[in-house]
Amino acid sequence: MATIGMGDIKKNIRLIIGEVPCKVIEFQHVKPGKGAAFVRMKAKSFLNGRVFEKTVHAGDKFEVPEITFKTMQYLYDDGEQYQFMDNDSYEQIGLSYEQCDDASKWFKDGIQVDMIFYKGNAISVSAPEVMELLITDTPPNFKGDTSSGSKKPATLETGAVVQVPYHVLEGDTIRVNTVDCEYLEKVK
């Protein structure tokens, strides 16, 4: 297995910390006035979605997990797990709510997602980076709202809530960045 050191750590890099495959979500290189440089990072476990902090010093090495991705179709929530179907073999795979974590707020029937496998087992899933979704609820506009440049909350068909400009109305379809949970544009 390949290894990475302190200088290779950056956002979205995958590594194994204490037998757990993780993804770095935040990092900061620190060079104190005295002593050696180090890296403070926040990593998210692929196994349970938990985020934890770790300090990495020069000389520390991490293995890179052998992770594979497969496109699968979201089917439904059975009350205990989310069910997905392999598009090639039609095999169904269930993932717990904990394994799906933040991606679950973007699930809608038939959506194609990337299933993440580690050592042959499905461990997590990620939604498409950009999606087109219908707004099911948002407050009405009042005179003068559009000139302020501020935003209002909008509930999407999946249940996710994003901040949108005032010109966007209930019933509109918008493009959303699912990674940052941000409005991108209104779909014509």
UniProtKB/Swiss-Prot annotation:
Keywords carried by this UniProt record: Cytoplasm, Elongation factor, Protein biosynthesis
Main location: cytoplasm
One biological process term in Gene Ontology: peptide biosynthetic process
Gene Ontology molecular function: translation elongation factor activity
Signal peptide region: none
Alphabetical list of CDD domains matching this protein: S1_EF-P_repeat_1, S1_EF-P_repeat_2
Locations listed in the record: Cytoplasm
Pathway field: Protein biosynthesis; polypeptide chain elongation
UniProt cross-references to SUPFAM superfamilies, sorted A to Z: Nucleic acid-binding proteins, Translation proteins SH3-like domain
Domain of life: Bacteria
Alphabetical list of InterPro entries matching this protein: Elong-fact-P_C, NA-bd_OB-fold, Rib_uL2_dom2, Transl_elong_fac_P/YeiP, Transl_elong_KOW-like, Transl_elong_P/YeiP_cen, Transl_elong_P/YeiP_CS, Transl_elongation_fac_P
Any one Gene Ontology cellular component term annotated for this protein: cytoplasm
Protein family membership: Belongs to the elongation factor P family.
HAMAP family: EF_P
Function: Involved in peptide bond synthesis. Stimulates efficient translation and peptide-bond synthesis on native or reconstituted 70S ribosomes in vitro. Probably functions indirectly by altering the affinity of the ribosome for aminoacyl-tRNA, thus increasing their reactivity as acceptors for peptidyl transferase.
Protein name per UniProt: Elongation factor P
Species in which this protein is naturally found: Sulfurimonas denitrificans (strain ATCC 33889 / DSM 1251)
